[in-house]
Amino acid sequence: VSFLLSPSAQPPPSPRPSPPPALWTPGDRPPDGYALLFPGTGASGGPGLGALAGSGPAAHRIVTDVLDAVQEGLPRDWPSLRRVLLDDPASYRAAARTPGVAQLADYATSVAVDRVLRAAGATPGFAVGQSFGEIATLVSAGVFTIADGARMAVDAVGVLARHGRGGGMALLQTAEPRAQALIDRAGASGEVVVACVNAPELTVVSGPDDPLERVVDTARADGARATRLAVPYLSHHPAMAAAGDEWYAMVRDVPRRPLQLPVYSPVRGRAYTDGDDLPRALADCMAHPLRLPPILRAVHDAGATAFVEAAQGDTLCQCVRLTLPKARTWAPLHQAPRGARPRAAGPGPSNGRDAAASPQPPAAPTADT
């Protein structure tokens, strides 16, 4: 689900080269005032915390502390995240068969990246959460504890498993107006909806399986690249309103503190305030669409010095570069290919390369659940 399995999944890469891979190294940090990006989870393809924890004793201590705090919020019968992400990463694939493990692994990774960067002296000025990533965003902003965020995520997994089956999501490489026109042409209006706009020419649609397939076929016949995402649920769809209400009832009384960082929501279309019912806002992610480009522009206009992906990979950094070609982006855990020598992320666009040189989206990931 985009709320669980990131709708930022993209179609196969074009022949144009992707940005150079990079891993974070101690002493390498973005300029103060950067915007943290927290993607929807489940699309990273596996654990990436080992590289972060291995970057130095301080980072290792922070990562293990975060994993222990996340574990505190998990059911007792869940696998140990410290074991499957750090001590025995080869066991991760088997552990990820437990519903929600992949999503909580990504949640832990997002929180850990944020904490390690701050410990290195980098001070964020903004945070943007995409779908499920809004939970980690509000943890980063000091609203919820790490353990409470984990509990909320586990509850969301259960609700979506009960309510969201029988549908899915597809990515259309086209702008929102054309995507809506393709839905109409496929005779799927009211069943398939625009769920997520990730970049000016990247639109995710969601709906029941049969009409969703008609939209995909119609898009391809019209010359648009269309990819059915490995997402076994509806998400960002009006049919999930009851699921959102159920989850809200479960999390509405979670203790919260005032925002310590400006948080921008692509679902609400603005920055949150302390007067907002934030659990309600999170629950709305299940049924309401998100539009990322206007939020990225708003954060940029508000003074963000760079955009930093608090996750494994660089999916949202790619969306930034498609929306703001001159923006500076950092992907601390953009994994290097096997056998490649890790390179520190540089301060310039796309880790040191001109952003305009590589605006193409990355390959679509397979689902972890």
Regions found by a protein language model. Give the residues of each.
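Short Gly/Ser/Thr- and Asp/Glu-enriched loop/turn motifs at secondary-structure junctions
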Residues: 165, 196-202, 230-233, 258-259
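Short, charged, surface-exposed secondary-structure boundary motifs
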Residues: 238-239, 337-345
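Helix N-cap motif at beta-to-alpha junctions
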Residues: 175-176, 207-212
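Intrinsically disordered, low-complexity terminal tails and inter-domain linkers enriched
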Residues: 5-23, 349-367
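Acyltransferase
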Residues: 224-310, 314, 318, 352
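Short amphipathic alpha-helices in soluble, non-transmembrane regions
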Residues: 183-186, 212-222
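Gly/Ser-centered flexible loop/linker motifs
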Residues: 179-200
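FabD-like malonyl-/acyl-CoA
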Residues: 3-8, 19-182, 225-231, 306-325, ...
